[in-house]
Each structure stands twice: as structure tokens, then as C-alpha cells.
From Swiss-Prot:
DNA binds at K308, R313. Residues 253-337 are annotated as: Head domain (RuvB-H). Transmembrane segments: none annotated. Homohexamer. Forms an RuvA(8)-RuvB(12)-Holliday junction (HJ) complex. HJ DNA is sandwiched between 2 RuvA tetramers; dsDNA enters through RuvA and exits via RuvB. An RuvB hexamer assembles on each DNA strand where it exits the tetramer. Each RuvB hexamer is contacted by two RuvA subunits (via domain III) on 2 adjacent RuvB subunits; this complex drives branch migration. In the full resolvosome a probable DNA-RuvA(4)-RuvB(12)-RuvC(2) complex forms which resolves the HJ. Its EC number is 3.6.4.-. It comes from the Bacteria. This is Holliday junction branch migration complex subunit RuvB. One of its GO terms (cellular component) is cytoplasm. Belongs to the RuvB family. One of its GO terms (biological process) is DNA recombination. Has 3 domains, the large (RuvB-L) and small ATPase (RuvB-S) domains and the C-terminal head (RuvB-H) domain. The head domain binds DNA, while the ATPase domains jointly bind ATP, ADP or are empty depending on the state of the subunit in the translocation cycle. During a single DNA translocation step the structure of each domain remains the same, but their relative positions change.
């Protein structure tokens, strides 16, 4: 096993160890939890398999965790799949026919399924039936196979890329939003307890403030602060130690990292504050378009550092102030919109 593979395996085990089992352990997203709890409990009281669920929103907010929670709540098995792996009907068939009654079938990145596979999924979702082609050529025939009733849970960072026929087949649909600092702090309290990490309240709040509203990142930063404190601070984890540990990762007090700063300074230094197209930015900062749109832009827009216009991305006055730059082009560009 290579070092890189070993680290990835360790990270996966780390994430799984902190995954909440039930909704009572899932902090934040309060309105979503209330709706989902009602939706699942109502189906269970009627003795029915819950309807299909779609969770969408930025990466790292808990979509996969919610799929596990749905399976845990209904007390059934969970079958995992990824959209990019489901291109042809044959890619789906084995998974669908292996499902037991009430199982939860989770498809991550469901927007990346192949079109033919997606259309094959429609009858499975609606009628719990699929058609199988037997033989080939002139003697080919289609046989309809019954499936055990199941709950499909789809997750996507790009709900706009889902086709209307697929989207409308989900009985429950909810967007996950970025978490507040307080919600992230509660998550970190739970995580530190599970990991046996002793950290004071100020340290956990400092980590929460720099976690971009994202639990996955918060938990990874907690682990980094633990390692930093172990080597540099005699295992003492307070607010000052957390601040030093995160500064070592080049994460500032707004949660902006090296790529965020590079993105903002590139727009300011080379494009006079914008507007500039996403393709041009992708080349300039050395990140692919999907990463910029899914990982970096949503947080920068949420915090008010950039805005999207018909002509491209522009930095805001807040970005100039944060970077201590003079906004030479901001007024004229704003008047031109």
C-alpha cells in the first residue's frame, strides 16, 4: 500500500468514525431534520417503505451521512453507488436486483449518471420493476422483473444538472446549507469527545469559525489542531493554540485558504477586480472549473467576497478591504452593470 493510499484510507476511517447514526446526533440543518423525521416516521407508522429522497448542496455538509441515517432509521441495509460508475443499464441491474425489501440505495453524485442508466432507473423508482433483455439479435426478447420495494437516496452538488423526470420522482427533496459557527462548534464538541481530544471552548469556536461552514472540514481541522498541539504545545488545546495551528495551514480568521486568496488577488491584480470569466480564472489559478464552482465560489459568494455578473466574476469592496487593497476599478465597474 502506497503512502498516499494509506493516508486516504485513514481519512476515510476517520470520517466514518465520526458519522452520526441517527438524526439526534446530526447537528444543524434544523428545518431539514424536522421534515425528514416526519417523512420517515409517517411511512414507518403506515408500514410502508419511505419514498425516495434527494439531498443537494455544497460538498461536505452531510449528504452521505443523511443516507446512512435514513437506513439506520428504517432499520434496513444500505447499498452504496456513485453516479459516474452508472453509465449503462447493466451497471444498475446487479445493484437493483440485490436489494432486499426496505433497503436504502444511495447514489452519490447522481447528476453524473449516464443518460441511458438514468432512464432505466425511472421504472425501478416508480413501479419497482425493470426490463431485462434476454439474448440478442432477432431472437432478443424483454422480460420484466419485479424488484423489492426500496428507498433511493440521491446526493448531488449540482441539482440544476438533474433532469426534470428524475427530479420529480423524489418524494422528499432538501437542500443542505452551510452551517453556523455555533452548529459547527456543537459538532466539534461531539467529535472531540469521540476522539478523546481535550480542547477548550475557545479552541473549538476558533476551529468552527475557520471551517467554511462545513462539518467535514471542521473535523479535519480538529485533527490537525490535535496533531499540532501534540508536537508543539504539550497537548494543550486552547484558542491561541488553535489559531497558531490554523495559521500554519494558511487559513485566515474568515476561513479563507491559500486558493481563496489566490483567486481574489488574481481577479484584483490581473483583471482590475473583474468581471472575468470562470474559464479564464480556472487557467489563471490552476484549478479546474468544477472545483472552483463547487468548492471555492459558493463560500466566497456567501461571505460577500465575490459576486457573479452576466459578464463574469467580480470581487467586492469587502474583498479589497480584507486584502488591504485599493479598489481602483470597483466603482466604475459597478456603475457599468
Amino acid at each position: 500500500m502506497t503512502h498516499q493510499v494509506a493516508v486516504l484510507h485513514q481519512d476515510k476511517k476517520f470520517d466514518v468514525s465520526l458519522r452520526p447514526k441517527g438524526l439526534e446526533e446530526f447537528y444543524g440543518q434544523h428545518h431539514l431534520k424536522e421534515r425528514l423525521d416526519l417523512f420517515l416516521c409517517a411511512a414507518l407508522q403506515r408500514g410502508e417503505v419511505p419514498g425516495h429522497c434527494l439531498f443537494f448542496g455544497p460538498p461536505g455538509l452531510g449528504k452521505t451521512s443523511l443516507a446512512h441515517i435514513v437506513a439506520y432509521t428504517v432499520g434496513k441495509g444500505l447499498v452504496l453507488a456513485s453516479g459516474p460508475q452508472l453509465i449503462k443499464p447493466s451497471d444498475l441491474l446487479g445493484l437493483l436486483t440485490s436489494l432486499q425489501e426496505g433497503d436504502v440505495f444511495f447514489i452519490d453524485e447522481i447528476h453524473r449518471m449516464g443518460k441511458v442508466a438514468e432512464e432505466y432507473l425511472y421504472s425501478a423508482m416508480e413501479d419497482f420493476k425493470v426490463d431485462i433483455t434476454i439474448d440478442s439479435g432477432p431472437g432478443a426478447r424483454s422480460v420484466r422483473v419485479d424488484l423489492a420495494p426500496f428507498t433511493l437516496v440521491g446526493a448531488t452538488t449540482r441539482s440544476g444538472m438533474l433532469s426534470e423526470p428524475l427530479r420529480t420522482r423524489f418524494a422528499f427533496s432538501a437542500r443542505l446549507s452551510y452551517y453556523s459557527d455555533q452548529d459547527l462548534k456543537e459538532i466539534l464538541v461531539r467529535s472531540s469527545h469521540l476522539l478523546g481530544i481535550e480542547a477548550d471552548s475557545s479552541a473549538l469556536l476558533e476551529i468552527a469559525k475557520r471551517s467554511r461552514g462545513t462539518p467535514r472540514l471542521a473535523n479535519h481541522l480538529l485533527r490537525w489542531v490535535r496533531d499540532f498541539a501534540q508536537i508543539r504545545e504539550g497537548n494543550c488545546i486552547n484558542g491561541d493554540v488553535a489559531e497558531k495551528a490554523l495559521a500554519m495551514l494558511l487559513i485566515d480568521d474568515w476561513g479563507l485558504n491559500e486558493i481563496d486568496i489566490k483567486l481574489l488577488t488574481t481577479i484584483i491584480d490581473y483583471y482590475q477586480g473583474g468581471p472575468v470569466g470562470i474559464k479564464t480564472l480556472s487557467v489563471a489559478v490552476g484549478e479546474d472549473i468544477k472545483t472552483l464552482e463547487d468548492v471555492y465560489e459558493p463560500f466566497l459568494i456567501l461571505k460577500g467576497f465575490i459576486k457573479k455578473t452576466p459578464r463574469g466574476r467580480m470581487v467586492t469592496q469587502l474583498a479589497y478591504d480584507h486584502l488591504k487593497r485599493h479598489a481602483k476599478n470597483l466603482l466604475s465597474l459597478g456603475e457599468g452593470q
